[in-house]
């Protein structure tokens, strides 16, 4: 489609302008001008009509073209506007996704920081566990070393006496206790059968014979080879091993001890040995156990003598003004881990892992846990209480003794041959 040239379009605009001006003047004068110059500089109406007629077709074509262009522009504008909306939506979505990513990133960072904190706590906990395990390993190594030495000693002993049997070492001499065995001709320490007056059948015991006195041994600790964490029935019937020499560990049994001490008055001697191989003892008069119906209650009339001190009478540990009262053993019932007869709101026997005449709890405990070397600490025990073999009037409660022996002799026997160790009754610590 052709377009109006620029000169023609300008001439058209000039003529139109002049015509409008003349029309305005004629309107103002309300009459036509007869001026002969009229139309010289400004085309007349007829001239304008000619020009319009001449270029009207081109103007119409250009107008149509312009309309077409405008229509196309409008369409393109709609497309552009749609694209802009799409872009805006994409921007919004992108912003939302960016916010989500930001939030997720913050959560991830927080999670990582929390995991780092947890790992730090685990690290601290592991350090403490490593230290604890290291200490346990050290203690176990010491224990293994001692066991290895004991194994060597046992093998050496076996190599010397493997031909001997317990059966061949039991003497045929018998009696109601070891003193009667001596009275009936027994001369050497060893294994004998005795039958207390009310016993239904005889039972085997170790008799320690010295200077004409026959001691009936009811308990012995020697090397930790026997576990003293036992129940009520085991302590009632007895456990451990009897040997021709006093080199094994055992508990004779509460029922047997009751039968023995119920037939006459007996002296109880407690022999103690520490890890420096120092020996001390404590003697009690008229020692006896009541029957099982009374929970094998412990009785004695007095502390006779000894250089180990009277731990059965209790001891002031300095923890409580009533420590001595809480730790006396006179009149106490026998307790085992599963049969609690003590005066404590907890269970002394369960915490200590053994049977004994517990109060709340004890000052002397010869059935406690065996600790090699003597000294032990709170960190070595399951509960924060002393559970070793203790005699508080000699060594403190965190020292476990090496060897103990509990033995009975009828009251009234002459003990002048006991190394001149007759002493008056005392209550001071034996190691002061």
Swiss-Prot record:
<feature type="compositionally biased region" description="Polar residues">
    <location>
        <begin position="421"/>
        <end position="432"/>
    </location>
</feature>
<dbReference type="InterPro" id="IPR002181">
    <property type="entry name" value="Fibrinogen_a/b/g_C_dom"/>
</dbReference>
<protein>
    <recommendedName>
        <fullName>Fibrinogen gamma chain</fullName>
    </recommendedName>
</protein>
<dbReference type="InterPro" id="IPR012290">
    <property type="entry name" value="Fibrinogen_a/b/g_coil_dom"/>
</dbReference>
<comment type="function">
    <text>Together with fibrinogen alpha (FGA) and fibrinogen beta (FGB), polymerizes to form an insoluble fibrin matrix. Has a major function in hemostasis as one of the primary components of blood clots.</text>
</comment>
<keyword id="KW-1015">Disulfide bond</keyword>
<dbReference type="InterPro" id="IPR036056">
    <property type="entry name" value="Fibrinogen-like_C"/>
</dbReference>
<keyword id="KW-0732">Signal</keyword>
<feature type="binding site">
    <location>
        <position position="344"/>
    </location>
    <ligand>
        <name>Ca(2+)</name>
    </ligand>
</feature>
<feature type="disulfide bond">
    <location>
        <begin position="178"/>
        <end position="207"/>
    </location>
</feature>
<dbReference type="GO" id="GO:0070527">
    <property type="term" value="P:platelet aggregation"/>
</dbReference>
<keyword id="KW-0356">Hemostasis</keyword>
<dbReference type="GO" id="GO:0072377">
    <property type="term" value="P:blood coagulation, common pathway"/>
</dbReference>
<keyword id="KW-0106">Calcium</keyword>
<dbReference type="InterPro" id="IPR037579">
    <property type="entry name" value="FIB_ANG-like"/>
</dbReference>
<dbReference type="GO" id="GO:0034116">
    <property type="term" value="P:positive regulation of heterotypic cell-cell adhesion"/>
</dbReference>
<feature type="binding site">
    <location>
        <position position="340"/>
    </location>
    <ligand>
        <name>Ca(2+)</name>
    </ligand>
</feature>
<feature type="domain" description="Fibrinogen C-terminal">
    <location>
        <begin position="169"/>
        <end position="412"/>
    </location>
</feature>
<keyword id="KW-0479">Metal-binding</keyword>
<dbReference type="GO" id="GO:0005102">
    <property type="term" value="F:signaling receptor binding"/>
</dbReference>
<keyword id="KW-0175">Coiled coil</keyword>
<feature type="binding site">
    <location>
        <position position="342"/>
    </location>
    <ligand>
        <name>Ca(2+)</name>
    </ligand>
</feature>
<dbReference type="GO" id="GO:0005577">
    <property type="term" value="C:fibrinogen complex"/>
</dbReference>
<dbReference type="InterPro" id="IPR020837">
    <property type="entry name" value="Fibrinogen_CS"/>
</dbReference>
<dbReference type="GO" id="GO:0005201">
    <property type="term" value="F:extracellular matrix structural constituent"/>
</dbReference>
<feature type="glycosylation site" description="N-linked (GlcNAc...) asparagine">
    <location>
        <position position="227"/>
    </location>
</feature>
<keyword id="KW-0325">Glycoprotein</keyword>
<keyword id="KW-0964">Secreted</keyword>
<keyword id="KW-0094">Blood coagulation</keyword>
<dbReference type="InterPro" id="IPR014716">
    <property type="entry name" value="Fibrinogen_a/b/g_C_1"/>
</dbReference>
<dbReference type="Pfam" id="PF08702">
    <property type="entry name" value="Fib_alpha"/>
</dbReference>
<dbReference type="Pfam" id="PF00147">
    <property type="entry name" value="Fibrinogen_C"/>
</dbReference>
<feature type="region of interest" description="Disordered">
    <location>
        <begin position="413"/>
        <end position="432"/>
    </location>
</feature>
<dbReference type="GO" id="GO:0046872">
    <property type="term" value="F:metal ion binding"/>
</dbReference>
<feature type="signal peptide">
    <location>
        <begin position="1"/>
        <end position="24"/>
    </location>
</feature>
<dbReference type="GO" id="GO:0051258">
    <property type="term" value="P:protein polymerization"/>
</dbReference>
<dbReference type="GO" id="GO:0042730">
    <property type="term" value="P:fibrinolysis"/>
</dbReference>
<feature type="binding site">
    <location>
        <position position="346"/>
    </location>
    <ligand>
        <name>Ca(2+)</name>
    </ligand>
</feature>
<comment type="subunit">
    <text>Heterohexamer; disulfide linked. Contains 2 sets of 3 non-identical chains (alpha, beta and gamma). The 2 heterotrimers are in head to head conformation with the N-termini in a small central domain.</text>
</comment>
<feature type="disulfide bond">
    <location>
        <begin position="348"/>
        <end position="361"/>
    </location>
</feature>
<dbReference type="GO" id="GO:0030674">
    <property type="term" value="F:protein-macromolecule adaptor activity"/>
</dbReference>
């Amino acid at each position: 489609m052709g377009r109006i040239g620029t000169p023609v379009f300008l001439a058209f605009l000039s003529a139109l302008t002049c015509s409008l001006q003349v029309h305005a003047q004629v309107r103002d004068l309300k009459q036509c001008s007869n001026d002969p110059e009229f139309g010289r500089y400004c085309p007349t109406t007829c001239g304008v009509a000619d020009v319009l007629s001449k270029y009207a077709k081109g103007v119409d074509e250009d107008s149509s073209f312009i309309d077409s262009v405008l229509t196309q522009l409008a369409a393109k504008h709609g497309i552009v506007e749609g694209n802009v909306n799409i872009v805006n939506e994409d921007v919004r979505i992108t912003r939302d996704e960016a916010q989500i990513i930001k939030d997720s990133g913050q959560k991830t960072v927080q999670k990582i920081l929390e995991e780092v904190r947890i790992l730090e706590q685990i690290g601290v906990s592991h350090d403490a566990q490593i230290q604890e395990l290291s200490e346990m390993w050290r203690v176990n190594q010491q224990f293994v070393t001692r066991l290895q030495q004991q194994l060597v000693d046992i093998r050496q002993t076996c190599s010397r006496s493997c031909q001997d049997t317990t059966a061949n070492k039991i003497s045929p001499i018998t009696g109601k206790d070891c003193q009667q065995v001596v009275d009936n001709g027994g001369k050497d320490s060893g294994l004998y059968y005795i039958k207390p007056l009310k016993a239904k059948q005889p039972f085997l015991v170790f008799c320690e014979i010295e200077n004409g006195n026959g001691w009936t041994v009811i308990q012995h600790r020697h090397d930790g080879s026997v576990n003293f964490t036992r129940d009520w029935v085991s302590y009632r019937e007895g456990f451990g091993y009897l040997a021709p020499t006093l080199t094994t560990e055992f508990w004779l049994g509460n029922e047997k001890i009751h039968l023995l001490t119920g037939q006459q008055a007996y002296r109880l001697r407690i022999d103690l040995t520490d890890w420096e191989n120092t020996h001390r003892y404590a003697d009690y008069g008229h020692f006896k156990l009541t029957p099982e119906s009374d929970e094998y209650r412990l009785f004695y009339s007095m502390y006779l003598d000894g250089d180990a001190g009277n731990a059965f009478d209790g001891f002031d540990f300095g923890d409580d003004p009533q420590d001595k009262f809480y730790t006396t053993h006179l009149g106490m019932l026998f307790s085992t881990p599963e049969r609690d007869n003590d005066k404590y709101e907890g269970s002394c026997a369960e915490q200590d892992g053994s049977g004994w005449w517990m109060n709340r709890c004890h000052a002397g405990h010869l059935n406690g846990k065996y600790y090699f070397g003597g000294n032990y600490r709170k960190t070595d025990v399951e509960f924060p209480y002393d559970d070793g073999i203790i005699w508080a009037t000699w060594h403190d409660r965190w020292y476990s003794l090496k060897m103990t022996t509990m033995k009975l002799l009828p009251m009234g026997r002459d003990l002048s041959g006991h190394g001149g160790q007759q002493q008056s009754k005392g209550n001071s610590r034996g190691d002061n």
